[in-house]
Amino acid sequence: KLNKILGVNCLITDVGSTKKNIIKLKNKNLNMKLNWISSHPIAGSEVSGPEHGNKNLFLNKWCVIIKEKKQNSKKIKLLSKFWKKIGSKVVLMNPVNHDKIFSITSHLPHLIAYNLIKTAQDSQKVQRKNLIQYSAGGLRDFSRIAASNEIMWRDIFFSNDNIIKAINLFTKNLNSLKKIIQNKNNKKLLSRLSNSKKVRTQIVQLKQDVAKPDF
């Protein structure tokens, strides 16, 4: 359908969270494939729809523009200009690295959030009221992430093969942490916790931390 209506000078972009599949489809089916430059603005919230629009949503947030081997450099510059005009910081990235990076920084955290809520439900089936009443801090923040659109996240999980590797790595580290706690290994536990604190500090220094987190 796009092949019938697209003009020669038309610029197309998408804002999906995974890139491998959409780029494969684009390169296979679109005549003017060089007119399609894929984007991924790293901004959003757990709510969706026009009623939740936010004029400052992209302000000072990263937007990844996907760099392929064969591409129209003028179109990349034009798309970069567009994202910068609405406040984004632009970075170029190839589709393979994009899907690997965001399987860890975005997709895995959401998966963990969904599973944590399931775990909390399973452990409190008799005392659901208590679960809700005392969900301050950690669980409440995770529940915000788990409130994200389930259809969108189903598609993200199914379209990024890297999520399985991310889950395996997370499981490996979780089992390691479990053994440390079982063995009451004070030194190793403090080291793990301290290291996580340092990474958190680095994230803040890179201005990736905001009052209302974006995922």
Go through the PLM ranges and name each one:
Residues 2-51:
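Rossmann-like NAD(P)(H) cofactor-binding subdomain of soluble oxidoreductases
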Residues 19, 40-43, 97, 136-139, ...:
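Glycine-rich beta-alpha junction loops
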Residues 52-57, 152-155:
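Short, flexible, solvent-exposed loop/turn segments with mixed acidic/basic and small polar residues
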Residues 128-196:
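Interdomain hinge/lid region at the active-site interface
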Residues 193-200, 207:
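Small-residue-rich helix-loop
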